[in-house]
Amino acid sequence: VVPYNDDGPAVGCQEISFKTVASWVNSPDAFKITIDTRNLNTSSSASNQFRLNLNKGFPDNLIYDFSVDWGDNQYNNNVTNDITHTYLIPGIYTISIIGNYPAHYNADTYRDNFKLLSIDQWGTQQWRSMKNAFYYCENMVYNATDIPNLSQVTSMQNIFHRAFKFNGNINNWDVSNVTDMTGVFFQASLFNQPLDNWNVSKVTEMDGMFYATPFNQPLTSWDVSNVNKMQDLFNNARVFNQPLNNWNVSNVTD
């Protein structure tokens, strides 16, 4: 900025340069979710709070450094640890996250899992893990239309475990580097979407993947030759009735 007045350039004033940073709320780069703080569970945060739990423990040891807009004109920058936000008014808010946020994580059954209402946008995050990402998120629906970057993801263990309302079209996901699909749709009681485009050739574990789901889509295109664990793969999946006679299960031991 060059100082200036009615007589021309100001003399003896300091020139200051700055840049304007646009809000990331409407950015296609942001990871966006919608929550309802009033959906309480045992050991959840208060009815006017929401907590982001970070997957920093062994064995993933992920590093975070992100900015979060909480949807109430409040935000935090350079977040590196678990964080809880308190809203003035309990209710529904859309949270936008940008920066180094390698994994969304629901540590166990009794946190803020029930507060998540929807996945709205994946953004351009480089995801590193999907383990327990939406575990026990029983009220969550899928509204995202973009595709997550899963090129560095090896574990999708329990990603939609007991996500009762989830029925998203995720057939275009690149899961070619995933090795662990244990419990991916375990008791996801609405899920019945095509998955025939998935490349599962590196997967070694599929225990309980479709346990108690209404899934009934063709899987003849799957290369399961590296899978060694299939225990309860279709257990209690009562409507599943698709041919699997071309599957190579020679490496399955469990």
Q: Where are the model-predicted features located?
A:
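Negatively charged
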Residues: 23-254
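Beta-strand-rich extracellular modules
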Residues: 2-6, 98-100
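Extracellular fibronectin type III
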Residues: 4-23
